[in-house]
């Protein structure tokens, strides 16, 4: 709270991607977001600033604990990923109705959200909204399946992990780019 007037809206801290799926490995980066109730228009800017400051404080604390900053900046201290429920609904509706490559990339990270703190009812409401839109926009599942087939999990014929043979990730599997599960 540190000098901030606490907004009169509920919020929920979300873990995303491998964090959301509980598949986090020891050496991983952060993927997180903030979801908060849509405030009254006159409170919108203060509420946004409050939750961005909270996102900054938490992400910096996680960095101090050894969790690297997300290279794609998908973290709660980024305005794009610190949104009211109405903002998140707009994002997901756009991604579902316009499944272009960038939308599918966001889908593979953000559809695996898991509430880890706060009002989980907000995450439940968002999940219901997403499911309604996916059912109504039937073509999205086909695009998602095609994307999954183009980015298979890193498994060999014998079901062993395929690891990187060069670069800075030699001997490591890149699970955050090749796995996609749902639910929390």
PLM features per residue range, with description:
Residues 1-184:
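A nucleotide- and high-energy phosphate-metabolite-utilizing enzyme signature
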